[in-house]
Amino acid sequence: MSGCGCGSSCNCGDSCKCNKRSSGLSYSEMETTETVILGVGPAKIQFEGAEMSAASEDGGCKCGDNCTCDPCNCK
């Protein structure tokens, strides 16, 4: 969606919407759920996080400052 590309040519392409709030694509929402399981054994704490971002479909790339990829972690 954001035009980010990985590999030796890691970049945010022409459709990069960095620092432009008109379409709302530069916003990210973070939701975290904490689960505490108590019982006979030691306490176990489990964190489940779901991050939604416009660049989440770009294989780990997201647009950073000045339309650079931050980070570019494609696998």
Swiss-Prot record:
Q: Does the keyword Metal-binding apply?
A: yes
The text of the family note is: Belongs to the metallothionein superfamily. Type 15 family.
User: What Gene Ontology molecular-function terms does this entry list?
Assistant: metal ion binding
**Superkingdom to which the source organism belongs:** Eukaryota
InterPro entries the record matches: Metalthion_15p (IPR000347)
Among the Pfam families in the record, one is Metallothio_2
Q: Mind telling me which PANTHER family this protein's record contains?
A: METALLOTHIONEIN-LIKE PROTEIN, METALLOTHIONEIN-LIKE PROTEIN 2A
The entry's keywords: Metal-binding, Metal-thiolate cluster
Q: What protein name does the entry list? A: Metallothionein-like protein 1
Cited function: Metallothioneins have a high content of cysteine residues that bind various heavy metals.
